[in-house]
């Protein structure tokens, strides 16, 4: 049933906005709209508004039994001056005292101002005619309801009185009201003046059974208005004058073997009262003696715990079970087929069940019962077969439900044009053949999408004779009631998973772009802030802190800049050879390093330091930059130290010549005072020297170019360090240490050497080696 949600008669437009949002979100995530609609039905706590000229309204779960504890509301809105007419097609609401449990309300106002027009029971109410342009409809089922009532189905039409003409499928009353054609001569006054029932050419052959109250049935005599209890139906006694209460009664025996090519049977409690204190188990064996398929049709009225099992072949075998039917299939026809003309029907009912069993008919497929018409276009053959397998009875003619695959039982109906089919429920609406089984409802009750034998292109045929979109097949969600749209599917990722992954990747990509943008923005702000406070002094300071570290002691020895001392002894020529190899490898590495460095690499290093090593010095501080100048060379405990700064005053030379010492053997001289020379233990002689080392080459090797094998030329020959030389620039080899001096033993002060410094083309600093 097509439903439209709204907040009220005046608030309908406002209610469509949330519906549109829900539908768009559902379409984006699942690729469909249908799953969002049921949540907005009339029984979900929201009002359902109808503004169509004609329509059909059903109780919840129709044609199944309505559930207990349900509240539904509908609102029919017409134009100004319209008159609304409501006619009931079916009505079965559980009866109670003064309709206090389950009820249906109709009127022009909402509760509590609702007029007391409350309905319940099984008798079809008379037509409801509203002189106003709107009608409220409320349905309520109590939580204690048994759930065994089917509900209701009603049709409505709105329009003005005094109309000169009506549509082709409508009937015009004497007061000018237009009604659907099927409403004429139905023994219900919908015109209000009786004109729709006064000009009937022939009275109905039997009054509608709904004129009798619930739990009764009418006699079929033309003039009879007698209603009898259902217990007196098919009880072996004629209670109606014409014997109609015993006509066409099925076999009520509890189980039997049936051998005809067609027949009928029913459960023993079909027309009986409430079941006794014992359970009921019955089995029927059907053998048509025909190799062709047998067709079984059932009408169920089962209780909550009752069920019917149908098996293929003779005998109850689990591997041949066709279907198990329960109370959920009540009030709708059920058709099953079995191969080779054999089947078994088993009925199981609980004690004191409120159900009334079932009624069944069977026939060989391709044959029609005497009171049925064939679905095939050809006439019946000599053997009773038809061109198309299938049959329909006269009550099934033009009822809106396709009983034939070709739709022959719905063709040529008086309420529709020749090329159209009627909707179910006698609403007078019709639809074209192209609208049949395309998964788009054209009838308010969706009759054009029910019992589909074939589907339109682009749709998939479910095992329950429903059609869905082809794109819904194998999408990971069961859209057919039996799940046949997900059978035989390859292992594929569901569409919703793909959609979720796509959305997740888009969100992650967006977050990544935002993060990168923030990072570049922060870098830009930091660069601008750094440049705003950048001065010439800060740039010089940055250049100063990037100076390379001096070489280590091992590198100096390997380069031949200093001789090995006691803590790095050389005992043999093999060790000297290894040391020479280390020197050669270090020279090659330094040449390779000097050839690779260039301006581009220096600029890259500066950029890297600016990005990740921002100077930490306080802003405005001027770095003290002095030229690197070696004023003294200290040869102490195996370390080469360069003490920058001005050359201090020379110490007082040692006048003690009684025990001459070599330079560096005694304590250094003081600051002008000659300390007493006492007995002291001389340091161990430098015995572990390079075998090729000579004292006269000491000063010459101090100015060796690390990149060349030959010593660098000097301008002036080195002068020996004599303690007796009074010249302040002369090196002193005194072994006496001045107590006010912080210099270690063996200090040789000398003027700045004239040897050329080691320079690299790409470095800003120069390595001065003495």
UniProtKB/Swiss-Prot annotation:
Residues 639-753 are annotated as: Disordered. One of its GO terms (cellular component) is clathrin-coated pit. GO terms for biological process: endocytosis; negative regulation of fat cell differentiation; negative regulation of gene expression; positive regulation of gene expression; positive regulation of osteoblast differentiation. It is found in: Membrane; Membrane, Coated pit. Keywords: Coated pit, Disulfide bond, Endocytosis, Glycoprotein, Membrane, Receptor, Repeat, Signal, Transmembrane, Transmembrane helix. The chain crosses the membrane at residues 497-517. It is a single-pass type I membrane protein. Its main location: membrane. InterPro entries: CUB_dom, LDL_receptor-like_sf, LDLR, LDLR_class-A_CS, LDrepeatLR_classA_rpt, Sperma_CUB_dom_sf. Disulfide bonds join 43-72, 99-120, 166-178, 173-191, 185-200, 212-227, 219-240, 234-249, 254-282, 416-430, 423-443, 437-452, 455-467, 462-480, 474-489. Residues 37-496 are extracellular. The keyword Zinc-finger does not apply. The keyword Magnesium does not apply. Residues 518-770 are cytoplasmic. Binds GGA1 and GGA2. Belongs to the LDLR family. This is Low-density lipoprotein receptor-related protein 3.
């Amino acid at each position: 049933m097509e439903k439209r949600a709204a907040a009220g008669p005046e608030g309908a437009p406002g209610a469509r906005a949330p519906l549109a949002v829900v539908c768009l979100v559902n379409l984006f995530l699942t690729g469909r709209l249908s799953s969002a609609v049921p949540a907005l039905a009339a029984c979900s706590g929201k009002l359902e508004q109808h503004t169509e000229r004609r329509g059909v309204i059903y109780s919840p779960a129709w044609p199944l039994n309505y559930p207990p504890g349900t509240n539904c509301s509908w609102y029919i809105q017409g134009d100004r001056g319209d008159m609304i007419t409501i006619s009931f097609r079916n009505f079965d609401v559980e009866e109670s005292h003064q309709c206090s449990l389950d009820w249906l309300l109709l009127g022009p106002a909402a509760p509590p101002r609702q007029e007391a027009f409350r309905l319940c029971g099984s008798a079809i109410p008379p037509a409801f005619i509203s002189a106003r342009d709107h009608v409220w409809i409320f349905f309520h089922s109590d939580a204690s309801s048994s759930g065994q009532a089917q509900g209701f189905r009603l049709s409505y039409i709105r329009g003005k009185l005094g109309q000169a003409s009506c549509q082709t499928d409508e009937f015009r009353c004497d007061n000018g009201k237009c009604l659907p054609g099927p409403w004429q001569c139905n023994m219900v006054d919908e015109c209000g003046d009786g004109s729709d029932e006064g000009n009937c050419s022939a009275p109905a052959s039997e009054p509608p059974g709904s004129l009798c109250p619930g739990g009764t049935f009418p006699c079929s005599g033309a003039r009879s208005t007698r209603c009898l209890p259902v217990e007196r139906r098919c009880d072996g006694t004629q209670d109606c004058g014409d014997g109609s209460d015993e006509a066409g009664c099925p076999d009520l025996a509890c189980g039997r073997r049936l051998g005809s090519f067609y027949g009928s049977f029913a459960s023993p409690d079909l027309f009986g009262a409430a079941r006794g204190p014992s359970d009921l188990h019955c089995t029927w064996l059907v053998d048509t003696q025909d190799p062709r398929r047998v067709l079984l049709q059932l009408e169920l009225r089962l209780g909550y715990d009752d069920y019917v099992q149908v098996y293929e072949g003779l005998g109850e075998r689990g591997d041949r079970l066709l279907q198990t039917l329960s109370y959920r299939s009540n009030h709708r026809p059920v058709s099953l087929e079995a191969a080779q003309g054999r089947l078994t029907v088993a009925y199981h009912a609980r004690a004191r069940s409120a159900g009334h069993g079932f009624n069944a008919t069977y026939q060989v497929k391709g044959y029609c019962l005497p009171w049925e018409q064939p679905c095939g276009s050809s006439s019946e053959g000599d053997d009773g077969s038809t061109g198309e397998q299938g049959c329909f009875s006269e009550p099934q003619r033009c009822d809106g439900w396709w009983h034939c695959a070709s739709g022959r039982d719905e063709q040529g109906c008086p309420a529709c044009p020749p090329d159209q089919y009627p909707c179910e429920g006698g609403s007078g609406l019709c639809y074209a053949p192209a609208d049949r089984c395309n998964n788009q409802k054209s009838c308010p009750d969706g009759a054009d999408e029910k019992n589909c034998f074939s589907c339109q292109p682009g749709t998939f045929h479910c095992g329950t004779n429903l059609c869905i979109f082809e794109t819904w097949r194998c999408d990971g969600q069961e859209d057919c009631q039996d799940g046949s749209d997900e059978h035989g599917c390859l292992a594929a990722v569901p569409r919703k998973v793909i959609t979720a992954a796509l959305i997740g990747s888009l969100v992650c990509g967006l977050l990544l772009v935002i993060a990168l943008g923030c990072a570049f923005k922060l870098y830009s702000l930091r660069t601008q802030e750094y440049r705003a406070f950048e001065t010439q002094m800060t740039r010089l300071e940055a250049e100063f802190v990037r100076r390379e570290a001096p070489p280590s002691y091992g590198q100096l020895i390997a380069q031949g800049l200093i001789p090995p001392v006691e803590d790095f002894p050389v005992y043999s020529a093999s060790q000297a050879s290894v040391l020479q190899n280390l020197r050669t490898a270090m020279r090659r590495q330094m040449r390779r390093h000097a050839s690779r460095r260039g301006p581009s690499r220096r600029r890259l290093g500066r950029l890297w330091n600016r990005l990740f090593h921002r100077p930490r010095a306080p802003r405005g501080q001027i770095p003290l930059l002095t030229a690197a100048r070696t004023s003294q060379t200290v040869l102490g405990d195996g370390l080469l130290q360069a003490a920058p700064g001005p050359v201090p005053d020379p110490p007082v030379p040692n006048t003690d010549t009684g025990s001459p010492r070599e330079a560096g053997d005694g304590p250094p001289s003081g600051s002008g005072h000659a300390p007493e020379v006492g007995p002291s233990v001389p340091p161990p002689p430098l015995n572990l020297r390079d075998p090729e080392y000579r004292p006269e080459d000491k000063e010459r090797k101090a100015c060796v170019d690390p990149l060349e094998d030959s010593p660098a030329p000097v301008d002036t020959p080195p002068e020996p360090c004599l303690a007796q030389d009074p010249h302040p620039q002369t090196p002193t080899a005194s072994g006496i240490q001045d107590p006010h001096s912080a210099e270690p033993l063996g200090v040789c002060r000398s003027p700045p050497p004239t040897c050329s410094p080691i320079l690299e083309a790409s470095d800003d600093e120069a390595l001065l080696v003495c």
